[in-house]
């Protein structure tokens, strides 16, 4: 009999609940969430608590988990070991690591032998995403585009952009579309130099106090256009410079002395030998001159 009821539920598609009974939930991509299911007023044997979901991409109804309400709490758990859905002890449905395809409508029902639905709870789950990329402005500046979006697409009028606790400073442009809010941030003007070099922390505040934080890198430091200041000379540098200069002068002076000495010695080696005075030749010449007289 329970199988027949399940088939009827499968063919019915979306639950036709009142708008007041549908709760909208937002979950950031990659995070976990829980969807409570109220306990039935009376626990009877054979009652089944079932969780269904209907993806955004189609109208089909998918069975997520089904447990008996009179079973011990310790026996509850994942319907599939590889599934990211888990039924907790209070019959809440836990979703681990949300993805885009998890967006859609979820609801829980309690079926008894009379095939009545009791205490159903319907949730419209939307997955929030945050993206950041770089763009070039018409002036050639490197700007950052910060995007906060929701799946399925719905208008996000309640998105607030903050830098720290204050509005975003500098030249910022805001854009809103169906299912997305975009902030274009360019380098700030008129900001002190030391402050402008720090990364900027910008937050996107979304419904139900969900938020994404972005870190916008500081603009690259332009190359210096002025000459670097001359280094300051202290006493130790001056003494070292004088010592090096004195050593250089001494080496040059010694080199000159050695070079002159070697040059003088080389000149003496190249000059012809002077003949020595010979007394006998001079005596002979004097005698010869005396005879001629």
Curated annotation (Swiss-Prot):
Per the record, ranges on the Extracellular side are 20-237
Q: What is this protein called?
A: Lymphocyte antigen 6 complex locus protein G6f
Q: What do we know about how this protein assembles, alone or with others? A: Homodimer; disulfide-linked. Interacts with GRB2 and GRB7 in a phosphorylation-dependent manner.
Q: What does this protein do?
A: May play a role in the downstream signal transduction pathways involving GRB2 and GRB7.
Phosphotyrosine PTM positions: 284
Which organism does this sequence originate in? Rattus norvegicus
Q: Where do the Ig-like V-type domain residues begin and end?
A: 20-124
Q: Which residues lie on this side of the membrane: Cytoplasmic?
A: 259-293
């Amino acid at each position: 009999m329970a199988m027949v009821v399940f088939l009827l539920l499968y063919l019915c598609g979306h639950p036709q609940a009142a708008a007041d009974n549908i709760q909208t939930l937002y979950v950031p991509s990659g995070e976990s969430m829980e969807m409570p299911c109220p306990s039935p007023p009376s626990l009877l044997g054979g009652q089944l608590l079932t969780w269904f979901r209907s993806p955004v991409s189609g109208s089909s109804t998918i069975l997520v988990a089904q447990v008996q309400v009179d079973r011990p709490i310790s026996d509850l758990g994942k319907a599939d070991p590889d599934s990211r859905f888990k039924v907790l002890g209070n019959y809440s449905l836990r979703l681990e690591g949300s993805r885009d395809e998890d967006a859609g409508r979820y609801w829980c029902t309690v079926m008894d032998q009379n095939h009545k639905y009791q205490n159903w709870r319907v949730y419209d789950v939307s997955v929030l995403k945050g993206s950041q990329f770089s763009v070039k402005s018409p002036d050639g500046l490197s700007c950052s585009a910060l995007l906060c979006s929701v799946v399925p697409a719905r208008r996000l009028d309640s998105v607030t952009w903050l830098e720290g606790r204050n509005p975003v400073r500098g030249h910022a442009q805001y854009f809103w579309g169906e299912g997305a809010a975009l902030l274009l941030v360019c380098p700030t003007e008129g900001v002190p130099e030391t402050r402008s070099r720090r990364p900027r922390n910008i937050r996107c505040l979304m419904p139900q106090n969900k938020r994404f934080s972005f870190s916008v890198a500081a603009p690259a430091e332009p190359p210096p256009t002025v000459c670097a200041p001359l280094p300051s000379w202290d006493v130790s540098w001056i003494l070292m410079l004088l010592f090096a200069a004195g050593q250089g002068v001494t080496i040059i002076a010694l080199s000159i002395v050695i070079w002159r000495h070697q040059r003088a010695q080389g000149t003496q080696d190249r000059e012809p030998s002077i003949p020595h005075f010979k007394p006998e030749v001079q005596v002979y010449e004097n005698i010869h001159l005396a005879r001629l007289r």
